[in-house]
Amino acid sequence: MTLEQQSQNSLLNSFNETRNTTLQLVKNLERDDFGVQTAVFMSPPKWHIGHVSWLNEIVLSKTQQDYKFFSEELSEYLNSYYNQFGKPHDKSKRGVMSRPTVDEILEYFEVITNRVREVISKPLDKETMYLFTMAIHHECQHQELLVYDLQHLLGDQYRPAKRNESPISLNKEKKKIRINGGLYNLGYSGKDYCYDIELPEHKIYLNDYQIDTFPVSNAEYLEFMNEGGYDDYSFWLSDGWDAVEKNEWNSPMYWEKDEDQWITRDFVGKRKINQNEPVCHVSFYEASAYCKWANKRLPTEAEWEKAALWNNEKGVKTDFPWGNEKPTESHANLLESNIWNCSDIGSYENGKSNYGCYQMIGDVWEWTTSEFVG
């Protein structure tokens, strides 16, 4: 469905679903959890739910004549980096603020939800519909951020509102796929919503390359660790080795050594590392070092995208690895799957790409060698 074709009901339903998902993520938190900031790179839960409401209010102010803000004082705290709306509060100090209170933020969330519902229940022009669609996608982005902040904040103490079982993987044989190079159109050219950083679509030349069909597993990463991967500087970029020594890295974040085995504390609980799950919570430097140890390399953004989206038989790029059908629970492990841990490598047969690559979306974010210059 294009933006031009999107109905009022579709926009309203998407908005309601998104707001409900945000509330579900914090449903089982204690009041004391909402304001805690455990690291400079994360934000307190109350900031996230306030910030997504603030962005919706910015859209309201841009589209509604004589709009009156709920509270001018909230803006500085809830602004992230939009200097045109005032000086943002220092991100590293979001957790030192006891005001606004959790109750004030939750009230703000409810008020803005109702204000947006009232506006988008009526006919909208194209520009207004686009801005509210952008706000929905922005909130989905912060749901991802909220989840990884909850991992850092609570780990195995977090209780999701709903949990489903992970599918059983019947495919454990990792292969290398050869992909022919040539000119490739990187970026987006469709009519659905996209971020400006996905534009414009442009041609890029690729050499022939090979890519694994599965993400790197915990078992594979353990081999790197057991063979001294964190002790041998020759595998590491210079900045990466500095980080290893400064931070005393010896494993992925959230891994702990318990006598003779590695365990983790995640949304499932305190548990032994599942060797069939994709390795996660590793930095770019760790991913790069692993690849050098394994005599491989990380793909570029364009190489990754072609392996994920290019249908070589039809000569077209698809919206998703499996085609243009919207994601379902049979395609990928996404937030709405409510699984709350990674699925085993080789899961989601229906979600593999035309080249045969699995889990190209869902489960984990994947590193590339391409620098983000947006």
Where are these regions (language model features)?
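Short, helix-capping/interhelical loops that line the mouth of catalytic, cofactor-
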Residues: M1-S10, L60-T113, G155-S166, Q261-D266
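N-terminal regions that are enriched for targeting/export leaders
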Residues: T2-D32
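Short glycine/proline-rich turn/loop motifs
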Residues: T2-E4, H89-R99, K122-P123, L199-Y205, ...
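Active-site rim elements
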Residues: Q5-L11, V96-L106, M129-F132, N207-Y209, ...
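A non-catalytic, amphipathic alpha-helix used as a structural packing/dimerization or gating element
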Residues: N13-Q24, E104-V111, R115, Q141, ...
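Short, contiguous alpha-helical
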Residues: D32-K87, S121-S169, T213-N218, L222-E223, ...
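Functional-site microenvironments in short loops/helix caps that host divalent-cation chemistry
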Residues: A135, E139-Q141, L145, D149, ...
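Core segments of cupin and vicinal oxygen chelate
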Residues: F224-G228
